[in-house]
A protein has these predicted regions:
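Alpha-helical transmembrane segments of multi-pass membrane proteins
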Residues: 47-61
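Final/C-terminal transmembrane alpha-helix of multipass membrane proteins
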Residues: 161-179
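Membrane-helix boundary connector in multi-pass membrane proteins
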Residues: 123-129, 145-158
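N-terminal membrane topogenic signal
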Residues: 28-43
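Membrane-interface helix termini and inter-helical loops of multi-pass transporters
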Residues: 59-71, 181-184
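Membrane-interface helix caps and helix-loop-helix hairpins in membrane proteins
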Residues: 121-131, 179-182
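Membrane-interface loop-to-helix entry segments
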Residues: 73-87, 127-139
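Membrane-interfacial loop-to-transmembrane alpha-helix junctions, especially the N-terminal start
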Residues: 100-109
């Protein structure tokens, strides 16, 4: 069996099947390493697909013209921050998958990814600061539920979601400030 970041050994995935299966009893072979590597790559790709929803809704002259709070971060920080956060999210989802398979925590992960993907077109595409605020509040809630669900399966996975929740908390405050400073 494999251990992850000092956690107890990962149980064989076939434990949920009656009697198990011969091919799944030993989870330490080369095929498991390949399977885990491909799964991690899949989680990274799937997670990085979320921001592609906003590729046609990038900040432009409209965003530059908005009145911003003094604590608005410089534009260059968003790319590196989101790259790090998406990587942490993917690794967290992979850790949960390794321990629990495709269950409720990963369904919540998919829901929060959908909310994540929806914010950019609403904010930057439709220029709807109020609706973007409603949407990001739903995203924040979905992230919290995902974090708690991940925590129950894998504490390291839960911890990996904390920076994401913190960043979206900040983004929610920023969205609120922009909405208040720029009435329609």
């Amino acid at each position: 069996m494999l251990t992850v970041l000092g956690e107890p050994p990962v149980p064989p995935l076939c434990k949920y099947r009656a009697g198990g299966c011969v091919s799944c009893r030993d989870m330490s072979g080369p095929s498991t390493t390949l399977r885990n590597g491909l799964a991690l790559a899949g989680f990274i790709v799937a997670t990085f697909l979320a921001p592609l929803a906003g590729i046609f809704s990038m900040p432009g002259a409209w965003y530059a013209a908005l009145v911003k709070p003094a604590w608005n971060p410089p534009s260059w920080i968003f790319g590196p921050a989101w790259t790090l956060l998406y990587t942490l999210m993917a690794v967290a989802a992979w850790l949960v998958w390794k321990r629990d398979g495709w269950r409720r925590p990963l369904m919540l992960y998919g829901v929060q990814l959908a909310f994540n993907a929806a914010w950019t077109p609403i904010f930057f595409g439709a220029h709807e600061l109020g609706w973007a605020l409603v949407e990001i509040a739903a995203l924040w809630t979905a992230i919290l539920l995902t974090l708690l669900s991940f925590w129950r399966v894998s504490r390291p996975a839960g911890w990996l979601f904390v920076p994401y929740l913190a960043w979206v908390t900040f983004a929610t405050a920023l969205n609120f400030a922009l909405w208040r400073l720029n009435p329609v």
